Amino acid sequence: MAAPCEGQAFAVGVEKNWGAVVRSPEGTPQKIRQLIDEGIAPEEGGVDAQDTSATSQSVNGSPQAEQPSLESTSKEAFFSRVETFSSLKWAGKPPELSPLVCAKYGWVTVECDMLKCSSCQAFLCASLQPAFDFDRYKQRCAELKKALCTAHEKFCFWPDSPSPDRFGMLPLEEPAILVSEFLDRFQSLCHLDLQLPSLRPEDLKTMCLTEDKISLLLHLLEDELDHRTDERKTTTKLGSDIQVHVTACILSVCGWACSSSLEPMQLSLITCSQCMRKVGLWGFQQIESSMTDLDASFGLTSSPIPGLEGRPERLPLVPESPRRMMTRSQDATFFPGSEQAEKSPGPIVSRTRSWDSSSPVDRPEPEAASPTTRTRPVTRSMGTGDPSGLEVPSSPLRKAKRARLCSSSSSDTSSRSFFDPTSQHRDWCPWVNVTLGKESRENGGTEPDASAPAEPGWKAVLTILLAHKQSSQPAETDSMSLSEKSRKVFRIFRQWESLCSC
């Protein structure tokens, strides 16, 4: 009989302390039950216990079961983190602190030398103070390398579940994957066609890319295309220009591919799949303009030559001087001796198509009104100036200034305008760094084996591709078709070299 008394006393206490709640018109019994339930612990194994456990894990920052598998094992997420390490935010770091190592443990850059975890949102300052003491510098680097694991929050999964090492390495032990990726890069680059950059013969000699090696690579690509399905071959129709094929083959060996992220914008952009560097080809001399110069070099006369037949109208006209043909500039300050011959009224030479799309002021300007005045030269460093042609006095001081601006703004005819497939990578990219052997990687080593010859990644890939082709090549194979075509292209390269030496 004591139970009803206790219940009445409890009700009186509730009404006294929570009078406002009890008198509320909405759900008075439900409010009382809610207050009672808040003071009672749920049974073990019940639904409430599971919800409470999940809530506490969420509050404490504990990862869910699917989170490590989505973040740490996703190759796309890995390289999205690598892409945040720009040259302005992450520079001057040793190889053990490369973006590939930082992204392995879930770090991204938010400011200069400032890292942030993509999961627990922890911050890590990775600045390296200038020090003349080499031991202190190495100690600081070792501390930062250790902090990549220890600077995370308590319940973060990255220290225990980093991304695989293979994400930041070239698959040298898997020739089939190398050949497949090599073909994919080649096909993507062929879509750029004549927008591919021109290659300097000296760079090809330095890379030891001979005609025979290029021929073997082209045969390998042809064989792999034959092995693809009929549907794949119909959707990947390639051009017939052998010069495009040779250039795309060399670029793909060095790890470059056509950037697909900006394909709807129709930009001539190539990217590296490892260091995520994107290069706009409008800053380099392209095959299209080089072919125009080469064709014009065999038909030079004393008078200006009109536009080539069969070429698009957007290509530049051919000037009357061989030196002007190579410089493709409106400013004759580099060669004062030829200035008098070029003061006569004539067609103004416009830039190539790539420059037309890169600067709003790169357009043909009116002819000079008198021999004492000339049109202001167009440079990339001018920005968006007055669209109308400005007439300025042809003073020696201004001519010298314009010459420096033209030469320092990646003109398409200077020595810097040729695309170097190896130097355009970032210094920590696996394509240009010395590759590690499989045993060295398993032992956690970072130094190359002294007994093995040190070679960059692209050269190791080239060796594997050539060995793969030679091992699968029959004893009697007619290799005259593509070999002869590649020799024709290299003759064109040598002709360019002779033109550049004029």
Swiss-Prot record:
The modification Phosphothreonine is found at T28, T84, T333, T384. Residues 35-74, 302-423 are annotated as: Disordered. InterPro entries: NuBaID_C (IPR013909), NuBaID_N (IPR012935). A motif (Nuclear localization signal) lies at residues 396-402. Phosphorylated. May also be weakly phosphorylated on Tyr residues. GO terms for biological process: cell division; protein ubiquitination. Disulfide bonds: none annotated. It is found in: Nucleus; Nucleus envelope. The modification N-acetylalanine is found at A2. One of its GO terms (cellular component) is nuclear envelope. Coiled coil: none annotated. It comes from the Eukaryota. Residues 371-380, 407-422 have a biased composition (Low complexity). The modification Phosphoserine is found at S24, S58, S62, S321, S329, S338, S344, S354, S359, S370, S381, S395, S407, S483. Keywords: Acetylation, Cell cycle, Cell division, Metal-binding, Mitosis, Nucleus, Phosphoprotein, Ubl conjugation pathway, Zinc, Zinc-finger. A zinc finger (C3HC-type) spans 102-156. Residues 50-72, 351-360 have a biased composition (Polar residues). GO terms for molecular function: zinc ion binding. Interacts with TPR; this interaction mediates ZC3HC1 nuclear envelopes (NE)-association but also required for proper positioning of a substantial amount of TPR at the nuclear basket (NB). Required for proper positioning of a substantial amount of TPR at the nuclear basket (NB) through interaction with TPR. This is Zinc finger C3HC-type protein 1. The gene is ZC3HC1.
